[in-house]
């Protein structure tokens, strides 16, 4: 009953959806693998919301975040979009208003967000490699014929966790196979992997030297922390107590819903498409090379049945068909050219002391306005 606020976190491997009420209470949540199609997963969640939401309730504001933020926002015409760090902070602050450190481990990324005086002060991310994240554990669980839930459960009773360090996945894979040959149990391997995920986060991403540097109010989140073994590994390695919300995996979506709630103003009409249009919408995806310049960017063009489109892969605005705005954006190269060479030399009659040639090379080239003024005036 009343106003509802929709938050969508289109992640790299999973899609999360949250619906919040007027007081920030969680009314609905969705968490599932997107199988490479976050938009399809979002529509699936909206079908569930439509089936469960009474007529006395309505979605009045919406916000997206995550890897697919712009795609989902463009497809559904959502009201707002926000970067992941802010969305995660809003969610963490809802559970602990004094939070000063947020550790988020997702499917293919991990980040540490430090909060100072109520604002984001620093963000540390894993770099190009995604080893040691949630999909890393999932891959090993499947290779050992276990579900992720079973794999996490057996880790809690492991007697001799194997030491895998925090190296590259390729080397760790070899280490796991070697441990199996030496008789290590699945539980020992799972516990070792849980330790390695935390070691990677603390020592490779955050580059921690003293556990006290993490802060006094730590919130851990991300789907990987649904794994109790990972949470326990964090507590044992860092020696810190952390808050893990029971909705750790959908904190990005929940934070987006809270942002949608905060930015909503009485009487505001949502720009989000009606659910009937969303359910009837189709998407046509094609790829082409941009011919705007010599980069020849590979563009992915998503065309929606309602006429809108969303383009990715472009390195500049030419790729999305935007023309340069000559009225508002100055052409600095054109300005530099005219500023440098739009000087009229003295006539032969006035140049009584002869002619001096200024080479258009090196720093003399850019210093020509100085030399012209110095010699002429």
Predicted regions and their residues:
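Phosphate/ATP-binding catalytic cores across multiple sugar-kinase/actin-like superfamilies
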Residues: 1, 192-215
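Gly/Thr-rich phosphate-binding beta-strand-loop-beta motif of the actin/hexokinase/Hsp70
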Residues: 1-23, 99-116, 293, 298-302
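Adenine-nucleotide phosphate-binding core of ATP-dependent small-molecule kinases
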Residues: 174-203
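Glycine-rich phosphate-binding loop plus the immediately following alpha-helix
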Residues: 34-39, 117-160, 249, 262, ...
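Short glycine-rich, Thr/Ser-proximal phosphate-binding strand/loop in the N-terminal lobe
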Residues: 8-40, 44-48, 123, 127-129
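Glycine-rich phosphate-binding loops at beta-strand->alpha-helix junctions
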Residues: 66-68, 196, 212-235, 248-249, ...
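Glycine-rich phosphate-binding/hydrolytic loop that grips phosphoryl groups
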Residues: 90, 137-139, 246-273
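Conserved phosphate-binding/catalytic loops in two-lobed NTP-binding clefts
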Residues: 79-85, 235-254
């Amino acid at each position: 009953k009343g106003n509802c606020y929709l938050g969508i976190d289109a992640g790299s491997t999973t899609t999360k959806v949250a619906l919040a009420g007027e007081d920030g209470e969680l009314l609905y949540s969705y968490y599932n693998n997107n199988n490479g199609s976050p938009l399809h997963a979002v529509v699936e969640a909206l079908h569930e919301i439509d089936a469960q939401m009474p007529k006395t309730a309505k979605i009045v504001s919406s916000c997206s975040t995550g890897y697919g933020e712009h795609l989902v926002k463009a497809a559904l015409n959502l009201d707002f979009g926000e970067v992941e760090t802010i969305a995660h902070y809003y969610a963490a602050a809802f559970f602990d208003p004094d939070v000063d450190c947020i550790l988020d481990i997702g499917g293919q990324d991990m980040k540490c967000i430090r909060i100072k005086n109520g604002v984001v002060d620093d963000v540390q991310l894993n770099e190009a490699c995604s080893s040691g994240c949630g999909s890393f554990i999932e891959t090993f669980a499947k290779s050992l014929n276990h579900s992720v839930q079973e794999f996490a459960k057996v880790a809690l009773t492991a007697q001799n966790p194997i030491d895998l360090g925090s190296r590259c996945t390729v080397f760790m894979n070899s280490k796991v196979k070697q441990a199996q040959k030496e008789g290590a149990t699945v539980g020992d391997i799972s516990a070792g992997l849980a330790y390695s995920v935390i070691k990677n986060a603390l020592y490779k991403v955050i580059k921690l030297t003293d556990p006290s540097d993490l802060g006094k109010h730590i919130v851990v989140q991300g789907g990987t922390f649904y794994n109790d073994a990972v949470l326990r590994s964090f507590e044992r390695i860092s020696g810190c107590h952390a808050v893990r919300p029971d909705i750790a995996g959908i904190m990005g979506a929940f934070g987006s819903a809270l942002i949608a709630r905060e930015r909503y103003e009485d009487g505001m009409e949502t720009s989000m498409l009606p659910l009937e249009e969303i359910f009837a919408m189709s998407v046509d995806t094609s790829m082409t090379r941009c011919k705007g310049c010599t980069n020849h960017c590979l563009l992915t063009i998503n065309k929606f049945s309602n006429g809108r489109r969303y383009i990715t892969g472009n390195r500049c605005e030419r790729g999305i068909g935007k023309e340069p705005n000559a009225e508002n954006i100055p052409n600095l190269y054109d300005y530099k050219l005219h500023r440098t060479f739009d000087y009229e030399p003295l006539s032969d009659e006035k140049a009584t002391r002869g002619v001096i040639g200024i080479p258009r090379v090196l720093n003399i080239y850019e210093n020509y306005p100085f030399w012209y003024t110095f010699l002429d005036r």
